[in-house]
């Protein structure tokens, strides 16, 4: 009698183990079926000073957008506060740990939004240097084994307060916007023009006129999300 009970318990445990193994396999398969999107950028991507950043930075809002649209996407936030494109800048993106993490992410889509910090006096060299280093950054992702699709997002315009410094930054970010469009055309990559999109929306910015607030982050998420949906119809 006792032996039979032991056999029944063993069978029960065996069935539970099989179910758990099957469930894990299903979960792993489901995760693999999700297209990974790597959001590359600076504090505008990371969500610096955005209210409740962990819920409202643009990559998280993009994840919510995809879930509401019932699309199987997994969004990764690889934004680095203070990061710039130029290799001689104070904080080159390619020297950051998150850059390495983004290349290991095996993304199917890379969304690059960099350039805002390149406009500062301490980071700026010239537009030719920016273009060269931006192209190098693109190539780093093009050479990945996962062969991700790459989208370029122009940085938003800078809301100048009239000071000499901000006026210079506003001019440089427009140069950068034009350079990114040229690079995108040359490489046959999708370019999302956040610069023009943001021109009439001062309400998207924090007080410094550079960083985006919660509404600005949502606008970026909607723009990227709309593009993903339209390209997968």
What are these regions (language model features)?
Residues 2-15:
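N-terminal Sec-pathway targeting helices
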Residues 8, 94-233:
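Alpha-helical cap/lid subdomain in secreted, periplasmic
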Residues 12-24:
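Hydrophobic membrane-insertion alpha-helices, especially the h-region
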Residues 23-79, 98-104:
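Serine-esterase "nucleophile elbow" of acetyl-processing enzymes
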Residues 39-41, 82-85, 117-118:
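Active-site neighborhood of divalent metal-dependent phosphoester/pyrophosphate hydrolases
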Residues 46-50, 85-88, 120-123:
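A generic structural signal for short coil/turn motifs at secondary-structure boundaries
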Residues 78-82, 198:
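Short, solvent-exposed turn/loop segments enriched in Gly/Ser/Thr/Pro and often Arg
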Residues 83-98:
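Charged, often glycine-rich, active-site loop that binds/positions anionic groups
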